[in-house]
Each structure stands twice: as structure tokens, then as C-alpha cells.
């Protein structure tokens, strides 16, 4: 069964996949989401966010005063919460579906990828390059307590962010996170 078909349980502090009992997103990720939003929104231009989760990064992106904010979400339960969240935001465009199979015509000044249960991550580098403006900022969920470049971007730098994760099976990170920073 694909992730989009799984039943999710929501609380203020996390989303749990009820089929696997794995945390999809947790509120302790807020410092990571804040720094990610600051990075991809430096130009205040057009931003693409792939994966809404609890909306933590989305709120930080909105606080940056960006021109436009496109959010792609595949899971119907999260999409329902996303549509409710976006209903009073004129600069937000919600797209339902799998980011890797959608036809995007726009280019973006900032791109953030934070998906769960995604079998298409091998396509992210080519996708990002094709959808980025010159000089676009890109970052993605790392899930490692080390510098990690699974998408084989030519040049990646990292910011080390202090975190205090709750005990979980979501990640092995304990004290810090390396936020990847790519400029295309």
C-alpha cells in the first residue's frame, strides 16, 4: 500500500502513520523548518514546498513575505488540512498529487522537499534543476546527523542546527541537524 492510502493520526505535536506506527512529522522539527524557510525565501520570490506535514515550514515561509508559495501534497488527510490552512492566503497555490509526475510550468526561486513514504526521490535533483530559476535556493529533509547529499547535487553546503527531538522511531538524530543548502 502506498503512503497516500495509509491512515494518519494527527495531534498538535505530531502526525503518526497508523499503518506503520512511524511518526511522519513532529513539532520538534520547528527549528529545522524555520531555518529551511529562511534559506529558500531569501529572494522573497516564488517558492515551491513539496510536502505540507504539520504546516510548520509553510507558516515560516508565509512569515517571510514571499511573492508566491506553491505547496504540493499527495496525502488526502494532509491535503484537507492544507486546504483549510491555505483558504485565507492569497499567495498560496495548492497542488494535489505526486510532485514527480505533475507537469509544472512555473520556475521557482526557492524549493523545499520534505516528503514521507516517497518512492521517487531519485528524481529530485533533475526536477529541482528543471524548475529552478538561476540562483535558486534548494534544501531538503536530511534525516541524518551528518552531511548527506543523496541527490548528488554538484555543490552542497550545510548549516548545523541544534535540535532537541522527542524520543521517536522517526530519526536517530539527537542533538543537531545538518541543513543542506544548494544554489542552482
Language model segments and positions:
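Class I SAM-dependent methyltransferase Rossmann-like catalytic core
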Residues: 1-45
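Conserved class I S-adenosyl-L-methionine
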Residues: 43-53
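Conserved SAM-binding loop of SAM-dependent methyltransferases across substrates and taxa
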Residues: 54-66
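Conserved SAM-binding motif I beta-strand of class I
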Residues: 68-73
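C-terminal substrate-binding/active-site "lid" region of AdoMet-derived donor-dependent transferases
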Residues: 77-78, 104, 119-184
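Conserved SAM-binding loop
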Residues: 82-83
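Conserved SAM-binding strand-loop segment of SAM-dependent methyltransferases
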Residues: 89-98
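A short acidic, Gly/Pro-enriched loop at the edge of an enzyme's catalytic core
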Residues: 100-111, 115
Amino acid at each position: 500500500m502506498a503512503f497516500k492510502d495509509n491512515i494518519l493520526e494527527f495531534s498538535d505535536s505530531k502526525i503518526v502513520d497508523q499503518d506503520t506506527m512511524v511518526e511522519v512529522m513532529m513539532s520538534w522539527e520547528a527549528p529545522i523548518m524555520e531555518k529551511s524557510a529562511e534559506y529558500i525565501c531569501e529572494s522573497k520570490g516564488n517558492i515551491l514546498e513539496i510536502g505540507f506535514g504539520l504546516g510548520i515550514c509553510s507558516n515560516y515561509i508565509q512569515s517571510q513575505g514571499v511573492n508566491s508559495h506553491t505547496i504540493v501534497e499527495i496525502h488526502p488527510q494532509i491535503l484537507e488540512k492544507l486546504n483549510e490552512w491555505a483558504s485565507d492566503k492569497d499567495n498560496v497555490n495548492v497542488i494535489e498529487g505526486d510532485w514527480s509526475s505533475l507537469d509544472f510550468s512555473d520556475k521557482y526561486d526557492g524549493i523545499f522537499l520534505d516528503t514521507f513514504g516517497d518512492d521517487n526521490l531519485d528524481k529530485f535533483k533533475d526536477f529541482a534543476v528543471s524548475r529552478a530559476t538561476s540562483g535558486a535556493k534548494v534544501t531538503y529533509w536530511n534525516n541524518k546527523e551528518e552531511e548527506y547529499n543523496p541527490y548528488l547535487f554538484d555543490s552542497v553546503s550545510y548549516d548545523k542546527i541544534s535540535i532537541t527531538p522527542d524520543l521517536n522511531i522517526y530519526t536517530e538524530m539527537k542533538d543537531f541537524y545538518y541543513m543542506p543548502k544548494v544554489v542552482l
